[in-house]
């Protein structure tokens, strides 16, 4: 059977449309997965479970050296703090953890944490990340995930 130029042209046009639709669908599907891949890579960039555990230990050490911030943690169970902060960072960074601790609002209620206290604590976390060799772009990605909690920590 011979095809006319019109039939071939229609076939090519239909094939082009089908390819365009398939590419659009694939792009939409993959863009929806991009955040999952990005967050999972943050977990990996932090060193996974062991890297996060080292970071939290270093952060706790930094807190213990701070005359301004250590008093806020005087009544805190260090083992629970270590466990819950590790869970939280693991979960936020796309790791296989689920945060099972209290809300930030409940954890910080009545502590009267000022803007300066909050900023000093963030500086301590940055110091800990520096000492653990966490690259600056990775630090910024983690801090970006933690920043929304600020409103639930200051002046409660």
Feature annotation, model-predicted:
Residues 38-39, 121:
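N-terminal alpha-helical segment
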Residues 29-32:
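C-terminal motif of bacterial Sec signal peptides marking the signal peptidase cleavage site
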Residues 2-22:
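Bacterial N-terminal signal peptides that target proteins for export
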Residues 27, 50, 63, 112, ...:
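Residues at alpha-helix boundaries and short interhelical turns
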